[in-house]
Design a protein with these regions (language model features):
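A short, Lys/Arg-rich alpha-helix, primarily the initiator
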Residues: 1-15
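DNA major-groove recognition helix of helix-turn-helix
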Residues: 10, 35, 53
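Residues in the helix-turn-helix
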Residues: 19, 30, 59
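Short alpha-helical "recognition helix" segments of helix-turn-helix
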Residues: 20-21, 49
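DNA major-groove recognition helix of helix-turn-helix/homeodomain DNA-binding modules
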Residues: 44-59
Length: 64
């Protein structure tokens, strides 16, 4: 079951997982785990990701 859409939004925004990891100060493997839905980010981190990608948090968790 997919719980987040981070990977899809990264593709839409043409931002790599490596770029996002650097901007968040996280490792690539952590971001990759979020993108693969192996781990879920906290709401606080999800909000940071939304800010970086210029989307609302809802766009990261549900289909439009």
């Amino acid at each position: 079951m997919k719980l987040n859409r981070i990977k899809l939004v990264l593709v839409e925004k043409e931002v790599s997982q490596t770029e996002l990891a650097k901007k968040l100060g996280k490792s690539f493997s952590t971001i990759n785990a979020y993108c693969s839905n192996r781990k879920q980010p906290s709401l606080e981190l999800l909000n940071e990701i939304a800010d970086i990608l210029s989307v609302i948090m809802k766009d990261l968790i549900v289909d439009k």
